[in-house]
Regions:
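Solvent-exposed, non-transmembrane regions of membrane-associated and secreted proteins
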Residues: 1-198
Length: 198
């Protein structure tokens, strides 16, 4: 009967992995928002992760995977935009939200505009409004859609701050590609509505 089916479904639901880590990351994101990202004084301040991810025991400290289906792009995602992380994949800027989703978050994810023959974020500025960008982490896959593209100066910190009430990721890379990238291009993506549960 339906009672037995419900009970069986509840028994097969697996518990949330790494619950203490998730609590810590959610608390970090909340504090970042409540503090108005006061330590985000320049893009140089974004190299170090606000949270050390090694506590999870994940190999190489990879936090997750960034996927952009339109570009057939999948990259490892790290916390903190250090030179090593940027060489190995995409990196969340320190002093911006950890990419776990949730209201009042904006995880800014940087990538080189091509590196050692690999495209990395070379074609990210070509994304159009409505294109999908996904992040898979220890707790599942978060689905976002591109809502805006913007070109900024490297010192325009306000452009990458959390926007109240929204669940965002912002892809960031150098612009223009051909002339050494003196500016930055932002591709702002918002979480798909049906998934704003966390």
């Amino acid at each position: 009967d339906s009672t037995e089916a419900t009970q069986a479904a509840q028994e097969t639901e697996s518990p949330t992995p790494y619950p203490e880590l998730l609590d810590m990351l959610e608390a970090y994101n909340r504090e970042l928002y409540e503090d108005d990202q006061s330590k985000l004084s320049s893009l140089a301040a974004t190299e170090q992760p606000g949270v050390l991810f090694s506590v999870s025991g994940q190999a190489g400290d990879v936090f997750g995977v960034l996927s952009i289906p339109k570009l057939d792009l999948e990259m490892p995602l790290y916390l903190g935009a250090t030179d090593k992380h940027m060489a190995d994949g995409a990196a969340q800027l320190g002093q911006t939200s950890i990419p776990i989703g949730g209201e009042n978050t904006n995880a800014v994810i940087a990538g080189h505009r091509g590196y050692n023959g690999a495209p990395y974020f070379r074609y990210v500025p070509e994304l159009q409004i409505g294109d999908s960008v996904d992040i898979t982490n220890l707790w599942g896959t978060l689905h976002y859609k591109v809502v805006e593209t913007r070109i900024i100066q490297p010192n325009d910190i306000d452009a990458i701050k959390i926007q109240p009430g929204r669940d965002l990721i912002t892809l960031l890379t150098c612009h223009p590609y051909a002339s050494g990238g003196r500016q930055r291009v932002l591709v702002i993506c918002e979480r798909m509505e049906e998934e704003n549960g966390r």
